[in-house]
């Protein structure tokens, strides 16, 4: 196992760092957050599609670039670093699932960005779920029983998000549109479960990028802010938690990359690693952003300061997928087997 990046992978990371650095400015993030669909920048989405992002993880015979999960994780990390107000994780996993199912006709408009397809990460009818991209998605892939279904958005459903602290286009679909069964049986369920694990890994990558940027914001503030006659970064109570955060984030990033490798190479522990990556990234990003906000003092809670954008999303982006503490039970189940009477 080599977790080092190839030249092509470094180029992917640099390209998307440049895109998000230019197009996902704090001003654009704030503007998207205040829009009715909350957390969606249509112009950024268009540029994201034009650069080929939506086809990175899709097989070449379906019109994609034949990339792996690691390439998508690199994109997600850069998106998280800039709080990019576009759907990254669920849409990427949904596109890969359509590719596995060889749904080339459905994939066409998805790869151009003209149709946004998300993934309902909990099994059951779409009408019973709060969808992370519900305010902007044109269609949703879901698991209903043993069937993978493609559910379209009804025309009468308004594109209005539920208010939330994470700047997410959260919305329920109480009355979904037309439903098409794409696959049925055990293989269909396995394919869908794999897609959900890919969301786990990509959400972890988003959180790693988010927290890395938050640590940078906090440490730069600590260098210039003075108290009691010296810069606060000189105090160990300020500096040491930043060092701990950087170390933990390096570990979280490596765990994300290992999970990507395990899933792409079909390792037996791939599912456990995916859950580990999400749980650890969620915990690490929350602690890192909390310290960065704390260092700002009262200013950290003011909307004029960027750190509050990161602090709010650190918890909300994780919670939108799952409770990180309960995710540890998923890790245990996948490592040791489900809980049974009398223990594991």
Residue ranges and their predicted role:
Residues 83-89, 96-216, 220, 342-344:
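FAD-binding core of flavoproteins
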Residues 1-82, 185, 194-344:
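Alpha-helical interface subdomain recognition
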């Amino acid at each position: 196992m080599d977790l080092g990046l190839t030249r092509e992978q470094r180029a992917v990371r640099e390209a998307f760092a440049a895109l998000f650095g230019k197009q996902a400015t704090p001003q654009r993030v704030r503007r998207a957050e205040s829009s009715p669909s909350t957390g969606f920048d249509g112009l950024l989405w268009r540029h994201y599609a034009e650069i080929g992002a939506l086809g990175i993880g899709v097989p070449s015979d379906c019109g994609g670039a034949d990339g792996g999960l690691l390439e998508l994780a690199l994109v997600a990390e850069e998106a998280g670093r800039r709080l990019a107000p576009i759907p990254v994780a669920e849409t990427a996993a949904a596109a890969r699932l359509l590719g596995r199912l060889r749904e080339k006709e459905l994939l066409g408009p998805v790869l151009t960005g003209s149709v946004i397809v998300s993934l309902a990460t909990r099994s059951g009818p779409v009408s019973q779920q709060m969808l992370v991209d519900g305010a902007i998605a044109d269609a949703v892939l879901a698991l209903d029983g043993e069937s993978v279904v493609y559910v379209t958005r009804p025309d009468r459903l308004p594109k209005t998000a539920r208010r939330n602290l994470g700047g997410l286009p959260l919305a329920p679909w109480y009355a979904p549109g037309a439903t098409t069964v794409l696959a049925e049986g055990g293989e269909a369920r396995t394919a869908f479960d794999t897609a959900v694990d890919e969301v786990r890994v990509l959400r972890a990558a988003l959180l790693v990028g988010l927290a890395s940027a938050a640590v940078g914001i906090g440490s730069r503030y600590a260098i210039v802010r003075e108290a009691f006659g010296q810069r606060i970064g000189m105090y160990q109570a300020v500096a040491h938690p930043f060092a701990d955060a950087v170390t933990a984030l390096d570990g979280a990033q490596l765990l994300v990359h290992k999970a990507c490798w395990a899933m792409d190479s079909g390792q037996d522990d791939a599912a456990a690693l995916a859950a580990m990556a999400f749980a650890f990234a969620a915990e690490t990003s929350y602690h890192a952003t909390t310290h960065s906000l704390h260092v700002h003092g009262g200013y950290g809670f003011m909307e004029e300061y960027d750190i509050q954008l990161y602090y709010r999303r650190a918890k909300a982006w994780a919670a939108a997928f799952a409770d990180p503490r309960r995710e540890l039970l998923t890790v245990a189940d996948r490592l040791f087997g489900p809980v049974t009477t009398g223990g594991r």
